[in-house]
């Protein structure tokens, strides 16, 4: 069934409230485990319907933020989603207190109960107004980003459309593009500062209402981090500082030499070669056709999956006016359909989206047989393993897109993945400091950003882009506003994806089997258990980075990048 035919209906809150209440009541009054399972199944059906409507609004609103109908529905969803979550929470209470708990654990697994108990620690009806305010502020940020109209090259462009100019072979074009983008953020500095300040305050208020000292521990629990805490993440950041930051500096020096510039500036970072980066050699349609070939040849499972996606119009890839920036994958439960949203811009990023978001989509397609919604996706850090590993597992097909620039693409891809990690931990350390010190001023935050940036990105130099010397670079990082503490997950997953890259070069078949099994498990196991089942070393364990990173360095050192 085509995505355009997926039916949307406005959710009636009172009706849903009555349905939940009735079903939870029959779950609690059930005289045997069979009765509870029957009620449980009906609750899942209701939750799937709600989730489907929420997702359809979210997708259609992000495709066209100017569509008045879905703009209004999106505001309505922001308003009611915390209340709807409250209904699920009421079910969790009934579930963990079930008199047939042992039998239910046998049927559904203990993880569901651990997740339910964890959620009960971060939600109560008392914080619904705060969660609504958080949603409203998050949407306000997205709209502000989408509102960018930058006059450049005789056109009016949004932020996604500015990316090719920031990667131009002409240094002067790069400088001007970087300045124009920075000016947008500088001109709106007060509004970005105010939105973030309000978000920090409202999140802190929620955490304190729920009995936490600050938002840090509360935020971790919201992300269902059952196995690690802020202390362990701090230890991991230390490993990054010791094992990756020196290599980061080395790679930036190589880049400086390749580009033949006296000093590598911020606006040079995105351009890897004077001859230009490796860009795909064709149109979006051409890319999609090669994508079909790639997934057909990769495995029978990926062939079936990608055929389903293309035949049902489940990819929205082109950048257009009023469309939100970025890329994501989501899932529409009633249709058992993943959906990929992206903004193609003619750069290698288009291919990364095609592999990265397809990694997410492929995983949920493999695990869509789970009835329990909690098992469709794993927790965030595990989710990112599928997407980032798919980027590497598709390497043998990169020649379809890049032709004689394939070696260049691979060098850029692998080095960029490594260069990303210190930036990822910069974002993470910044957020920990922000939520540990919620009362500081926006100016303090901007100064702290620059200080942490210096620690993990010692080569960064903003050159003539004076606006960024004021510590506003992070305004463009959507996760800092809308998904606190999520960003470190990309770096943890990157370390796991590096291991898949290493394994695929040693034994491709075995690497694919490990990956496929990981996808099939969905969210039915915890992060640490999933890593174990895929034969991956845990990034938190001392020595993991020291074991993985040298193999990446060895490959990068073997490339004659001066002649690519």
Regions found by a protein language model. Give the residues of each.
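Glycine- and acidic
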Residues: 122-123, 181-188, 228-234, 269-280, ...
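C-terminal, non-catalytic "cap/extension" segments appended to globular domains
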Residues: 227, 354, 362, 389, ...
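Flexible, glycine/threonine-enriched loop-and-boundary segments that flank and lead into catalytic domains
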Residues: 310-327, 336-338, 458-481
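A well-structured
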Residues: 1-277, 281, 564
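Long, well-ordered alpha-helical segments
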Residues: 196-207, 212-213, 251-255, 359-369, ...
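Active-site recognition of the HExxH zinc-binding catalytic motif
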Residues: 342-367, 384-387, 392, 430, ...
């Amino acid at each position: 069934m085509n995505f355009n035919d997926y039916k949307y209906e406005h959710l009636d809150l009172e009706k849903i409230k009555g349905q939940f209440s009735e079903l939870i009541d029959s779950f609690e009054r059930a005289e045997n485990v069979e009765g509870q399972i029957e009620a449980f199944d009906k609750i899942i059906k209701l939750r799937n319907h709600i989730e489907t409507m929420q997702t359809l609004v979210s997708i259609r609103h992000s495709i066209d933020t100017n569509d008045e109908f879905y703009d209004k529905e999106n505001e309505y969803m922001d308003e009611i989603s915390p209340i709807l979550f409250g209904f699920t929470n009421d079910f969790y209470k009934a579930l963990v207190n079930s008199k047939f708990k042992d039998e239910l654990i046998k049927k559904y697994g203990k993880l569901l109960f651990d997740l339910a108990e964890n959620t009960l620690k971060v939600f109560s009806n008392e914080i619904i107004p705060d969660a609504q305010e958080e949603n409203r502020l998050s949407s306000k940020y997205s709209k502000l980003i989408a509102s960018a109209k930058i006059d450049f090259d005789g056109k009016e462009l949004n932020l996604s459309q500015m990316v090719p100019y920031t990667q131009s072979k002409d240094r002067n074009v790069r400088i001007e593009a970087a300045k124009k983008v920075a000016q947008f953020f500088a001109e709106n500095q007060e509004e970005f500062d105010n939105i973030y300040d309000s978000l920090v305050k409202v999140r802190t208020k929620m955490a304190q209402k729920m009995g936490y000292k600050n938002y840090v521990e509360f935020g971790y629990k919201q992300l269902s981090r059952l196995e690690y805490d802020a202390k362990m993440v701090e230890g991991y950041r230390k490993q990054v500082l010791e094992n990756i930051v020196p290599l980061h500096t080395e790679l930036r020096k190589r880049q400086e030499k390749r580009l033949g510039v006296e000093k590598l500036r911020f606006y040079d970072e995105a351009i890897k070669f004077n001859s230009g980066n490796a860009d795909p050699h064709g149109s979006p349609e051409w890319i999609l056709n090669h994508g079909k070939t790639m997934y057909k040849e990769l495995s029978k499972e990926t062939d079936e999956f990608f055929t389903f996606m293309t035949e049902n119009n489940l990819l929205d890839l082109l950048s257009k006016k009023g469309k939100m920036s970025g890329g994501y994958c989501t899932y529409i439960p009633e249709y058992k359909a993943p959906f990929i949203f992206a903004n193609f811009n003619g750069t290698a990023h288009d291919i990364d989206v095609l592999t990265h978001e397809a990694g997410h989509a492929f995983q949920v397609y493999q695990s869509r047989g789970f009835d329990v919604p909690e098992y469709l996706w794993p927790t965030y850090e595990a989710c990112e393993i599928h997407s980032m590993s798919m980027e590497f597992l598709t390497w043998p097909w990169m020649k379809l897109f890049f032709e004689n620039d394939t070696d260049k693409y691979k060098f850029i891809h692998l080095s960029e993945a490594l260069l990303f990690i210190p930036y990822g931990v910069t974002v993470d350390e910044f957020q920990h400091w922000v939520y540990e010190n919620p009362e500081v001023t926006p100016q303090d935050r901007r100064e702290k950003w620059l200080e942490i940036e210096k620690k993990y990105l010692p080569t960064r130099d903003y050159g003539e882009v004076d606006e960024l010397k004021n510590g506003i670079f992070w305004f463009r990082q959507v996760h800092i506003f809308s998904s606190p503490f999520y960003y470190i997950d990309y770096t943890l997953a990157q370390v796991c994806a590096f291991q898949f890259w290493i394994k695929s070069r040693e034994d491709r078949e075995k690497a694919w089997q490990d990956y496929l099994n990981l996808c099939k498990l969905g969210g039915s196991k915890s992060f640490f258990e999933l890593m174990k089942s895929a034969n991956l070393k845990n990034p938190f364990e001392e020595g993991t980075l020291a074991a993985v990173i040298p193999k990446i360095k060895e490959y990068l050192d073997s490339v004659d990048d001066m002649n690519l």
